[in-house]
């Protein structure tokens, strides 16, 4: 009964939400007027430093149709598609709130920048196929007049996934599905693998899958900056600050089975300004939670998961920060320029970095080995004890590698099924999610942004059906399990 009630409510309510409440008046026009007034004052008082107008350019606007919490690639992609799909230019005011505009701790810029279609769920294959098309035609999507074209430095070297005897049948099923969805992937026997990549030790490998198109790696920072540049040209507003509070109203409904539900609607977002105790309230119609590894905390601020255990109101967003290391090493006798990104059955992976016999890679820790996410310090012992032996076993040339540097970043790790959370919350009716992708959010961001924008503007997914990724699955226990997590 609860499932039916939620579906009935989500349909008409989402498509009927108005976004036009705060559209009148342009902050861009006001900023222009302020600039003109300042120029006149300076001409009257030449050489004077006096400014009678308090500079509020660092503050968010008092009102915005949509507030996006998180300025990484996922949040920026949502903003892009909201503006691209709006019915009338300038119809929707969008504000992106990012607490660190240096992106020093951002998952986007600390990732290895890979893109692949080799997943175990068709939705993930579809998302990555569209994202590959987006990246391939990046200057058609993100071109800005009079600005130079973007160069994502895409390396189309593919992904090579290796399977043991135990995982071979699963790999065969996955590849069959990937091909049905349009991905260009081939299967390779150990003999074929040895012939194409003679530097690989095929011991323990029963089967391999190799991406022939639309796979490789690119520069995440370039994509991030390209999106920001495009959004500024589209009139999207940016604010450096931290969301600390939501002001909501509540209403109540009863399901056919007699269960009481409390519906919330966010009316105001409080943004604490950087290096200050000051906060700015922002009235809004829609909130998008794209806060990555910290999206669980943002959801809690909105009351998500604060109800009795076992109820929809008590169901938390199961996304938390997980620290992952990336190591860079030098190996003159390594695989060389033809090396794809290789993912070993042991969990280790690596790829070439540049043209100077450098490589990057790592492996994910077990649950018992999970490092403290409270800092981004690197554990070099983890490489020595866990990563290097696996690399050297698969690629004997790596016996002589020399580590040159390393860094750590965060996964927005979905502990439920390691898959994304996309779309509205069932009870906080105007909060939408774009989070929880557990390491593959960067590569799927263009498609996820489009999906969230479709849901906000039309009330349903239009191009890719991401219903299995809705928040309600956590309450109903319906896992959309992704098995191909690197």
UniProtKB/Swiss-Prot annotation:
What does the UniProt keyword field contain? Electron transport, FAD, Flavoprotein, Membrane, Mitochondrion, Mitochondrion inner membrane, Oxidoreductase, Respiratory chain, Transmembrane, Transmembrane helix, Transport
Question: Where does the UniProt entry say this protein principally localizes?
Answer: mitochondrion
Task: Look up the record and name the cofactor or cofactors this protein needs.
Answer: FAD
Xref: InterPro entries: FAD-dep_OxRdtase, FAD/NAD-bd_sf
Annotated membrane-spanning segments are 66-82
Stated EC number for the protein is: 1.-.-.-
Which cell locations does it reside in?
Mitochondrion inner membrane
Record has Electron transport as a keyword? yes
Its Gene Ontology biological processes? mitochondrial respiratory chain complex I assembly
Of the GO CC terms on this record, one is: mitochondrial inner membrane
- Its top-level enzyme class, in one word, is oxidoreductase
Q: Which Pfam families match?
A: DAO (PF01266)
Q: Name one GO molecular function term.
A: oxidoreductase activity
Q: Which Gene3D superfamilies match?
A: D-Amino Acid Oxidase, subunit A, domain 2, FAD/NAD(P)-binding domain
Protein topology in the membrane:
Single-pass membrane protein
Please describe the quaternary structure of this protein.
Answer: Associates with components of the mitochondrial respiratory chain complex I.
Q: What does this protein do?
A: Required for the assembly of the mitochondrial membrane respiratory chain NADH dehydrogenase (Complex I). Involved in mid-late stages of complex I assembly.
Recorded protein name is: FAD-dependent oxidoreductase domain-containing protein 1
**Organism of origin:** Bos taurus
What is the gene name? FOXRED1
């Amino acid at each position: 009964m609860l499932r039916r009630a939620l579906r009935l409510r989500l349909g008409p309510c989402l498509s009927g939400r108005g976004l036009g409440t705060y559209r009148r008046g342009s902050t861009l026009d006001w900023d222009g007027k302020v600039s003109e007034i300042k120029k006149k004052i300076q001409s009257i008082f030449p050489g004077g430093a006096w400014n009678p107008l308090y500079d509020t350019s660092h503050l968010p606007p008092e009102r915005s149709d949509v507030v996006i919490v998180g300025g990484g690639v996922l949040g920026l992609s949502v903003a892009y598609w909201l503006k691209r799909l709006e019915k009338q230019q300038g119809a929707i005011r969008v504000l992106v709130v990012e607490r660190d505009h240096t992106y020093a701790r951002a998952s986007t810029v600390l990732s290895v920048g890979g893109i692949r279609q080799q997943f175990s769920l068709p939705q993930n294959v579809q998302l990555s196929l569209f994202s590959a098309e987006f990246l391939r035609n990046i200057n058609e999507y993100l071109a800005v007049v009079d600005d130079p074209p973007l160069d994502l430095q895409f390396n189309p070297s593919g992904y090579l996934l290796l399977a043991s005897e135990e995982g071979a049948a699963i790999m065969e099923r996955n590849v069959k599905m990937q091909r049905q969805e349009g991905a260009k992937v081939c299967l390779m026997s150990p003999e074929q693998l040895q012939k194409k990549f003679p530097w690989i030790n095929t011991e323990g490998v029963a089967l391999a899958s190799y991406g022939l198109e639309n796979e490789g790696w690119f520069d995440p920072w370039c994509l991030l900056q390209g999106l920001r540049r495009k959004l500024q040209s589209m009139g999207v507003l940016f604010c450096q600050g931290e969301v600390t509070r939501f002001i909501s109203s509540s209403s109540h409904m009863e399901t056919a089975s007699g269960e009481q539900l409390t519906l919330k609607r966010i009316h105001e977002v409080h943004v604490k300004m950087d290096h200050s105790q000051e906060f700015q309230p922002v009235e809004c119609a829609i909130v998008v939670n794209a806060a990555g590894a910290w999206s669980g905390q943002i959801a809690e601020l909105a009351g998500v998961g604060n109800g009795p255990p076992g109820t929809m109101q008590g169901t938390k967003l199961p996304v938390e920060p997980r620290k992952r290391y990336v190591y860079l090493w030098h190996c003159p006798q390594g695989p060389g320029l033809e090396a794809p990104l290789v993912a070993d059955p042991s969990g280790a992976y690596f790829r070439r970095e540049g043209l100077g016999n450098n490589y990057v890679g790592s492996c994910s820790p077990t649950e018992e080995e999970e490092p403290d996410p409270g800092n981004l310090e690197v554990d070099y012992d983890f490489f020595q004890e866990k990563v290097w032996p696996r690399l050297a076993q698969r690629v004997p040339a790596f016996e002589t590698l020399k580590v040159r540097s390393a860094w750590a970043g965060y996964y927005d790790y979905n502990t439920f099924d390691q898959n994304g959370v996309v779309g509205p919350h069932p009870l906080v009716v105007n909060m939408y999610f774009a989070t929880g992708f557990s390491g593959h959010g960067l590569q799927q961001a263009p498609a996820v942004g489009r999906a969230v924008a479709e849901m906000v503007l039309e009330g349903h997914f239009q191009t890719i059906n991401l219903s299995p990724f809705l928040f309600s699955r956590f309450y109903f226990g319906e896992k959309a399990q992704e098995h191909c997590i690197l």
